[in-house]
């Protein structure tokens, strides 16, 4: 079982894809890491030797900020924006889109599920 930065990599996937399970490592960065460490990207995670796993772990920990450190850094940046009172910080705090998107319609991902407001009731028809 390959474990890097506290994350178990899926055994049946290729190493190239398995590394993307680490927060902060995407496909291109994964390919870069494998090229630098000399590990074949087509190798399955279960077939990695202990030495290869140790090399990957050492290279990633020395050259990249991943998982908890990256999440903490991101949260601190958002908190800093909110503390200095920027528009972006306010939008983060309110849970609204930060980058200028419209909110009259759409923005469901940021705003959450719809909250239906009862409309005006229809008057009974006269017959």
Curated annotation (Swiss-Prot):
| Gene Ontology CC terms, in alphabetical order | cytosol; small ribosomal subunit
| UniProtKB keywords | Ribonucleoprotein, Ribosomal protein, RNA-binding, rRNA-binding, tRNA-binding
Comp. bias regions, Basic residues: 101-127
Kindly give the HAMAP family that the UniProt entry links to this protein: Ribosomal_uS13
Q: Which PANTHER family match?
A: 30S RIBOSOMAL PROTEIN S13/40S RIBOSOMAL PROTEIN S18 (PTHR10871), SMALL RIBOSOMAL SUBUNIT PROTEIN US13M (PTHR10871:SF1)
* Family membership noted in the UniProt record: Belongs to the universal ribosomal protein uS13 family.
> What is the recorded name of this protein?
Small ribosomal subunit protein uS13
Organism lineage reads as:
Bacteria, Bacillati, Cyanobacteriota, Cyanophyceae, Oscillatoriophycideae
């Amino acid at each position: 079982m390959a474990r890097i930065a506290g994350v178990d990599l899926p055994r049946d996937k290729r190493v190239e894809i398995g590394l993307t399970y680490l927060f902060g490592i995407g496909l291109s960065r994964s390919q870069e890491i494998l090229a630098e460490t000399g590990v074949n990207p087509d190798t399955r995670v279960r077939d990695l030797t202990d030495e290869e796993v140790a090399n990957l772990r050492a290279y990633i920990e020395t050259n990249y900020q991943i998982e908890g450190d990256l999440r903490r850094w991101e949260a601190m940046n958002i908190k800093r924006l909110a503390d200095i009172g920027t528009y972006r910080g306010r939008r983060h705090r309110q849970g609204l889109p930060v980058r200028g998107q419209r909110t009259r319609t759409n923005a469901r991902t940021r705003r959450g599920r719809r909250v239906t407001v009862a409309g005006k009731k229809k008057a009974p028809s006269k017959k």
